[in-house]
Amino acid sequence: MFKIVSTSFFFLLNSFLFSQTGNVDENFKKIYNTALTKGKTYEWLEHLSNQIGGRLSGSFNAQRAVEWAREELDLLGLDSVWLQPVMVPKWVRGTFEYASIESSPGNTINVPICALGGSVATPSSGISANVIEVKDFEELERLGTNKIQGKIVFFNRPMRPDLINTFESYSKAVNQRFNGAEKAAKFGASAVIVRSMNLRLDDYPHTGSMSYGNLKLRERIPAAAISTNGAELLSSMLSLNPNLKFFLKQNCKNYPDVLSYNVIGEIRGTKDPDEVILVGGHLDSWDLGDGAHDDGAGIVQSMEVLRIFKKLKFKPKKTIRAVFFMNEENGLRGALAYANHVKKINEEHLFALESDAGGFSPRGFSFDCKSRDFKKIISWKKYFEPYMVDYFVQGGSGADIGPLKNGQVVLAGLRPDSQRYFEYHHSDNDTFEAINKRELELGAAAMTALIYLVDTFGFE
């Protein structure tokens, strides 16, 4: 009798699991078909990029982006749409920067540069000084004040081309951009120039955030990025003439903080509405280019997750919430404000997924979670394999959802192909024309599919 019951139970269990798998496969097809044949990501991104454009925190365009995002979320017929106030820094680039290499009196070559975000201006007449090239902070320390005083420090450590994951290459080079001015100022440098964070040789300078640490205002020095071609030229000319001079002029300025907003919309859960599944990206971008890949793509992909749920009449168990964070690029104020509010009201977040790596072909996801949860997640990989989204790795998520980390919530990041990303990142190159419609849509579909699985199965 026991054997018959056991056999029957095993048969029913297998039938149930097969039924679940069949439903998942069918719903994945519906999700992908909707994203690829009736998607809105490309249309949305065209407006955000071409009609609004670069949207640095505190700017008029950033406010326009907030209003646009709220209106589009309202049109989706969500259960709730609201703005979360947040004070953000305001930095203005001013007129375009100018730089030149002077090999001898009267002989100059112009090179492409851009001020780093948060940098102070040069004097109105600019700065002209000798240049000292370094690869890292250790070399800077060895040279000391005697050799650096009054000179322009040129940080010229390239991103490593031998690393397959270009974000790893970026992480090993970006400290010279972020901390270079602070380090060089302590040795009396008059300014810093940093090689752009770009694996390709081209004429586009790439901006990005930087910090002066605890330096007093009078101790701060101008900081600018030089294009990779410009860096190669300057380095080769220095090897021939160490006494050449570099001229730099920029009139950027920091202003007092201003009011801005995170934009939030959600579909309330039917069973556990107090448990939140978050999907999002950052609404702000740098002022160069249109911010199409960074991070307009993540914004419209997150919007598409909600739209597909509504279109397919999926009734989520948990609350599915999209958050468009403000000020990721130069402060993370939006992320911190959101996380602090969540903590204050003791709101439970089950899962958070961020898209902030460009609108390229999705390859998979990274997960910041416990091994127990990752074991469950890895069992879902089979559903993604037919769509060639099979890179599942434990470790890492996203900057804006990072402050939510509490040991319980599972954090994740969409991982698209990264090989071209840093050609566009933080530069005039990051425009709508650099977006591939199908790749953008595939990313949105993969995100929607993962959110669907988390809502359907959870992590228990």
Please provide the spans of the model-predicted regions:
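Noncatalytic luminal/extracellular "stalk/propeptide" segments of secretory-pathway proteins
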Residues: 46, 50-164
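A conserved hydrophobic secondary-structure block that centers on an alpha-helix together
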Residues: 136-147, 151-199
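Second-shell loop/turn segments in exported
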Residues: 28-36, 50-60, 97, 118, ...
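Acidic/histidine-rich catalytic neighborhood of metal-dependent amide-processing enzymes
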Residues: 179, 259-262, 285-377, 459
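Soluble metallo-hydrolase cores and metallopeptidase-like ectodomains found primarily
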Residues: 25-27, 102-105, 113-145, 212-292, ...
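Bacterial Sec-dependent N-terminal signal peptides
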Residues: 1-23
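N-terminal capping segment at the start of a domain
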Residues: 23-59, 96, 204-208, 212, ...
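Active-site-adjacent substrate-binding region
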Residues: 185, 191, 195-196, 216, ...
